């Protein structure tokens, strides 16, 4: 039955024009799934990673930093749709400040680094079929961003969702697009090789790549980290932040007892009865930002040596074929995480960076924060925090979770929260202009739906 499932999946991918390299990788993971791989990493098989370099202690000369940055390319993951916020396109296209989107601010950051260091610093997006057109349209408004004849993007691969009952490719006539999914952001390495972009970058003299999620405005180009990475001689290094009690979800690095390799463990790879170890900020003191640095030359050599398969751990993701309909057919998506490649490279390391390099926007709570006066956006597209610490935002998900609902309830902009420790909104409230929140601000559900008047203090 499952042999038929694999063959059917391979035919479906070939008919859709998926790269042969991507089909080979999919086959590897399909066979792992068949063999019963769960991707789980029990606590007893690892040692916590507690000692890593800190950017605060790094000493790199201006010239070393500039030289390393001149050989660096920036790759931003831009293939996911902001479905959790009700979006049907890339989150990076949401406006942040003065009509500028995440993508516009990213371009500002890249152009500022080019001016400061006199380097070419290409910016390349990893898009999906569903994010490509809109994103390239935004970049078309910045013709100066393209350099060295390199493309502005490359496409991540796609693979069939598998029926959970028999592992055959799912069929969904209501929307055949929903029969497909991306193979997780671990696909970046396969897609770089299969697209020819990896060879093109090496041919033009680029040696290092820095990657991050396109919604993380904190992950600006850093000549200092580039200089550290080049000097370290390591093939691969993620940026890590020190955990706080709020950081219970982010993946962490650990040392595998069997071979001493550094590995990444995410929540989906942790046995349920061991989640208390995973969330212990003292046992596993750093979390993974998904800002990564890797050596393009070593990546190519490793991929060629392994027949294009890095062998990242499988993430078995159980979903429904229509993510918006929990009663639709159960499916399994075969995924890998970009950060899991840390275990594929001997000599991989990591670096602790300040919290300012991790500003992801996963929810409308995060979006309110980056749009608020907690941050100022400078001419270089960098977000600078105004108060000593960020305000904690909690908006009632019944009324603010989806972007359309969120925008409708802040027609005159978000409130001032720079003098607030927290902002909690219960119920359905529409905010007027110039609302100011201070201290531990709270709006109760009683009296809603309603409007909070212009100039109110809460």
Residue ranges of predicted features:
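Left-handed beta-helix
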Residues: 1-73, 227-458
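Hydrophobic/aromatic beta-strand patches that form the interior of the parallel beta-sheet core
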Residues: 75, 94, 124, 153-155, ...
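Residues immediately flanking
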Residues: 78-79, 214, 296, 364
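Surface-exposed, flexible loop/turn segments at secondary-structure boundaries
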Residues: 82, 131, 160, 217, ...
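Conserved short loop/turn motifs at secondary-structure junctions
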Residues: 122-131, 214-216, 355-359, 363
